[in-house]
Design a protein with these regions (language model features):
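Enzyme catalytic cores with a strong preference for nitrogen-chemistry domains
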Residues: 1-287, 303-307, 314, 334, ...
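ATP/NTP-dependent adenylation/nucleotidyl-transfer catalytic domains that generate, transfer
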Residues: 202, 227, 253-290, 294-540
Length: 540
């Protein structure tokens, strides 16, 4: 049995467009494929979120299934990811439809519904009653959907039921998946599916979605394993593909597994590219400060959209160093990004004069510093509005964690490109770009001390610990969900950890007003981080 794994980039909610895309993949495939398999919820695009709460959307989804089945008359069978109504009007099933000879031949319902991190499937779906199978050319094929194969994994120790165990006796297993990218995820997928293949002793096929959807990026990398868990084939990463594998033959096309920095780079580029395209933007604008964060964001945008579609605004104040302007211009010239320079000194004076009667007798403090950031935010938004460009924010995860950012200032924008990269990860990715990818980020940007330049001689370490320490502590508090005491036990000073933990808690109100950011870590801010705002600021 030759299996064709359809790996496509879908637009969420575009039922007719996604349907036609799937049809073309089948119609244009090479001859000899016995079964085609899409990713999970391919017809709707994953995740459809609260579109699923609209009865008419589900009705139209089912109509699209019937239409596709009819159009595929004469082609090989297709396992299609979609939804169907459940036991009650507002309960649904996440399912796979087997389409053949113009009809829906069989339905397979997802059993395990993830309800952690960015997954919220119990909000919409009710579980199926265990894994199922069907016969094709005398072969018994087991069907699972994404989470169904993760029950035995230490990654998700939540389930008593293991659908894979119910498939003993099948000749092969397929898994329709929509698994978002995080750093190192592909190795875990191949390990988990390898365990399933060995448990059943049969070839196992995994079809994944590809492309950016809001804050998520799906990396594709669909694959097939033999009954020992050895790789038979792997599709491209971060690109559409059709992987055709015959489990009776020797290993076939195996696309290379990407290194840690390259996979993050490609995830961020695809995330920006698809977010812009799917939201209707062709151009982007961002502030260029001469620092490493805006440099990396600009380089990602240039790669994603084309350098000629990116505008960098230089917004120097009286506190900006000459090097900041020069370094920004050098970066822009190296990458072909057009720039506009708008000094904000006159606007700072106007603001100070307007506020002087109210602030008389009070010393300057962070208020005046934040006014500079908000002046810049207004100018950036003006360019975004006037030219219809997507405004990219340039803050990193370290800053967003501890609130070292200004609401309605540098946080203004439509997409927070590097908000899931700690500062140390920003440096590492930039060095990787320059050393291995022919990157042209000026050395001065890589070596200067980080600074917001909101007062004379300011550096980030006036307010924060060194980034090596800060990021290590934050990783324990955020990704590993450790308490302050547990984190300090890893070799950190307890008062320092408690201070960082308090900053993390106090900044929650900022994070919940931040632009969506592209998830690349196991614990990003956004949909998978659900912390209270009006709560004790020393939670643990």
């Amino acid at each position: 049995v030759r299996i064709g794994l359809i790996q496509q980039n879908y637009l969420v909610g575009d039922l007719s467009g996604n349907r036609e895309k799937i049809f073309r993949a089948v119609a244009e495939a090479p001859a000899g494929v016995d079964l085609f398999v899409t990713s999970e919820l391919a017809l709707q695009g994953y995740p459809p979120r609260d579109l699923l709460l609209y009865h008419r959307f589900v009705e139209r989804s089912l109509e699209a299934v019937e239409t596709l089945a009819q159009k595929l008359t004469g082609f090989a069978p297709l396992l299609l990811g979609g939804v169907e109504f459940g036991s009650a009007p507002k309960r649904l099933h996440n399912c796979a439809f087997l389409l053949h000879q113009g009809k829906v031949v069989q339905r397979f319902r997802k059993t395990l519904l993830p309800n952690y991190d960015i997954f919220d499937e119990r909000r919409y779906f009710e579980p199926g009653q265990g894994a199922q199978s069907f016969l094709l050319d005398g072969q018994k094929i087991g069907v699972t959907i994404c989470e169904d194969v993760w029950a035995g994994s230490p990654e998700v120790p939540f389930y008593d039921l293991n659908p894979v165990g119910e498939l003993r006796g099948v000749d092969l297993m397929v898994n329709l998946s929509a698994s978002p990218f995080v750093r190192g995820k592909q190795a875990k997928r191949e390990m988990v599916l390898g365990d399933a293949a060995r448990a059943l002793g049969v070839p196992t096929f995994y079809a994944n979605q590809v492309g950016g959807t809001d804050h998520l990026v799906f990396d594709g990398s669909s694959f097939a394993l033999d009954g020992t868990g050895a790789l038979l084939g792997r599709a491209k990463a971060f690109a559409e593909d059709l992987l055709v594998v015959d489990p009776d033959l020797a290993p076939q096309r195996i696309e290379p597994k990407l290194g840690s920095e390259e996979e993050v780079w490609r995830a961020l580029v695809l995330g920006v590219k698809d977010y812009a395209a799917k939201c209707g933007f062709k151009t982007a604008v961002l502030g260029l400060s001469g620092g490493i964060d805006s440099a990396l964001t600009a380089v990602i945008a240039a790669q994603a959209l084309g350098a000629d579609q990116v505008t960098g605004l230089l917004l120097p104040s009286p506190y900006s160093s000459p090097g900041s302007v020069a370094d920004s211009l050098a970066l822009a010239q190296a990458y072909g990004i057009k720039t506009t320079t708008l000094p904000i000194g006159p606007m700072m004076v106007a603001m100070d004069l307007a506020l002087a009667p109210s602030f008389e007798g009070l010393p300057n403090d962070v208020t005046e510093e934040n006014l500079q950031a908000r002046i810049r935010g207004n100018l950036l938004m003006a360019f975004s509005n006037k030219f219809g460009s997507l405004l990219l924010t340039t803050g990193n995860k370290s800053e967003l964690s501890v609130g070292y950012c200004t609401l309605y200032g540098d946080m203004s924008g439509g997409l927070a490109v590097i908000s899931d990269l700690y500062k140390t990860e920003v440096y590492r990715l930039c060095h990787w770009l320059n050393q291995t990818q022919g990157g042209k980020i000026p050395e001065a940007i890589l070596t200067k001390a980080p600074s917001a330049e909101l007062r004379p001689g300011q550096t980030d370490q006036d307010s924060l610990p060194d980034y090596d320490t800060l990021d290590a502590v934050l990783h324990h508090l955020i990704e590993e969900r450790k308490s302050a005491a547990e984190t300090a036990a890893q070799g950190f000073d307890l008062p320092l950890v408690e201070r960082i933990n308090q900053l993390l808690s106090r900044a929650e109100f900022k994070r919940q007003q931040a632009a969506p950011g592209i998830k690349v870590s196991t614990q990003a801010f956004g949909g998978g981080w659900r912390m209270p705002i009006a709560a004790s600021k020393t939670l643990f």
